[in-house]
């Protein structure tokens, strides 16, 4: 109005199209963007779903603190002394408290040198007392009281119901070390899940692991026949049928 009053001619503004309208009118750009968003969404959803049930590094607090470092590391107790079922059965099993008492009838406290900055001698001694309470053991009279309490251990390694895994096949027949799947247990103060235990992880191991035939005439015969078939000097678990669906799923 001021410009008109002074006789000044003002150029009219050219109307511009909003960016979102211009984008909406460009069908090619809309198509490309939609495809990109769909693919990106599928990628992130797939990544999320693939992690469901994967509990790598899971280290729950147990009702009785059990140090694998002290038992398997410092005292060099063989894994299969406590997990004896791993030699002959599908499951490694949680050792019964009677197995613990094989030693702890005599060992009622730890040495002074066992203490660490994180865990005191008193703490470890308290865990042994928890064991005595659970089994109903009177350390003074060196006898059982008959009053026991179940220990509700928190499971760490938990495969889906549709997965079959046989410990004896791996430990006894294949001669696989426990640390291959469970990590350097002898150094763990708190037990955790070392490996992802996914299908891809198992298959990768089967493809890379050579079959041990020493002392196994059955495997030696199969190895002789299959090595000729595949034209290789050494067979992997995969070439021995380790990738067949029915071996792990039923």
Regions found by a protein language model. Name each.
Residues 12-25:
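Cytosolic juxtamembrane amphipathic/interface segments immediately preceding
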Residues 60-112, 160-250:
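Sequence context surrounding c-type heme c attachment/ligation sites in exported
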Residues 47-63:
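Ser/Thr/Pro/Gly-rich low-complexity linker/stalk segments immediately outside membranes or between
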Residues 51-55, 154, 180:
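Short, charged, low-hydrophobicity "junction" segments
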Residues 1-13:
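N-terminal intrinsically disordered, acidic low-complexity segments at the extreme N-terminus
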Residues 97-154, 158-159:
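Structured, soluble extracytoplasmic/luminal domains of envelope-associated proteins
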Residues 27-46:
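Hydrophobic membrane-insertion alpha-helices, especially the h-region
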């Amino acid at each position: 109005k001021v410009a008109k009053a002074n006789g000044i001619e003002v150029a009219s503004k050219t109307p511009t199209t909003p960016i979102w309208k211009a984008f909406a009118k460009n069908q090619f750009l809309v198509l490309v963007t939609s495809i990109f968003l769909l693919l990106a969404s599928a990628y992130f959803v797939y990544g999320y779903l693939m992690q469901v049930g994967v509990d790598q590094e899971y280290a729950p607090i147990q009702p009785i603190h059990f140090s694998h470092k002290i038992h398997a590391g410092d005292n060099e107790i063989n894994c299969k002394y406590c997990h004896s079922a791993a030699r002959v059965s599908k499951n490694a099993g949680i050792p019964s408290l009677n197995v613990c008492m094989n030693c702890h009838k005599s060992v009622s406290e730890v040495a002074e040198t066992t203490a660490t900055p994180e865990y005191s001698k008193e703490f470890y001694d308290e865990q042994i007392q928890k064991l005595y309470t659970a089994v109903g053991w009177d350390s003074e009279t060196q006898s059982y009281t008959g009053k026991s309490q179940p220990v509700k251990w928190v499971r760490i390694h938990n495969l889906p119901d549709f997965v079959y895994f046989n410990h004896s096949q791996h430990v006894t027949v294949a001669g696989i070390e426990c640390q291959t799947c469970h990590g350097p247990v002898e150094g763990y103060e708190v037990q955790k899940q070392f490996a992802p235990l996914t299908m891809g992880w198992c298959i990768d191991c089967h493809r890379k692991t050579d079959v041990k035939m020493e002392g196994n005439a059955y495997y030696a015969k199969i190895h002789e026949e299959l090595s000729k078939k595949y034209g290789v000097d050494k067979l992997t678990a995969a070439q021995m049928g380790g990738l067949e669906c029915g071996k792990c799923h039923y």
